[in-house]
A protein has these predicted regions:
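Cytochrome P450 core scaffold surrounding the K-helix E-X-X-R motif
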Residues: 39-43
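Conserved Rossmann-like nucleotide-cofactor binding loop
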Residues: 37, 164
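Nucleotide donor/acceptor-binding cores
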Residues: 1, 70, 153-154
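NAD(P)H dinucleotide-binding glycine-rich loop of Rossmann-like/cofactor-binding domains
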Residues: 80-159
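Glycine-rich beta-strand-centered segment in the early N-terminal region that forms part
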Residues: 18-34, 44-84, 124-126
């Protein structure tokens, strides 16, 4: 399969990259769209020393499992679900996690990606594929609101240099 592979600070389109073999509990996804994120650009500059296929914002078709044949998007953190952090309800902070296209797990800048089935969400027919690729960045912003309730009349400050 074709894939955009990062090694050090250089990346190449690889025409014969190995198609992922899903681990138990994972589903093979045929990627339809993948979005470029500021994190991808930082990884190309050497951030976190990632080597592999970039890309964590995606929409694709599930090849197997309960979503077989459906368009899906996926959460990027692949948690262990065994540690105290996961069991306490904070799997996105799992110290043993891999992260699609960022940390220890090939991402979506390829024809196929393997993703834990529990990370997948079906895309409703009312949402186009071009719109669905933005689910991950919108969900990342929304996650902040879930972690900290902001009530009417309170002030907040937003810091950071991300693209959202």
């Amino acid at each position: 399969m074709k894939a955009l592979h990062l090694s050090g600070t250089s990346f190449d389109v690889v025409n014969e990259y190995p198609r992922p073999e899903p681990l138990p509990g994972e589903v093979l996804i045929r990627v339809l769209r993948a979005g470029v994120c500021e994190t991808d650009l930082q990884l190309i500059q050497g951030y976190m020393g990632f080597e592999g296929v970039l890309g964590h914002e995606f929409v694709g078709i599930a090849e197997s499992g309960r979503f077989a044949g459906q368009r899906v998007v996926g959460e990027i953190n692949c948690s262990c679900w065994k540690c105290d952090t996961c069991r306490s309800g904070l799997p996105t902070h799992c110290p043993n996690r891999t992260v699609l296209g960022i940390l220890g797990h090939d991402g979506a800048f390829a024809e196929f990606i393997a993703v834990p089935e529990q990370n997948l969400h079906a895309v409703p027919e009312s949402l186009s594929t071009d719109e669905a690729v933005f689910v991950e960045p919108v969900a990342a912003a929304y996650q902040i609101l879930k972690q900290r309730l902001v009530e009417r009349g309170q002030s907040v400050v937003v810091l950071g240099d991300g693209r959202l």
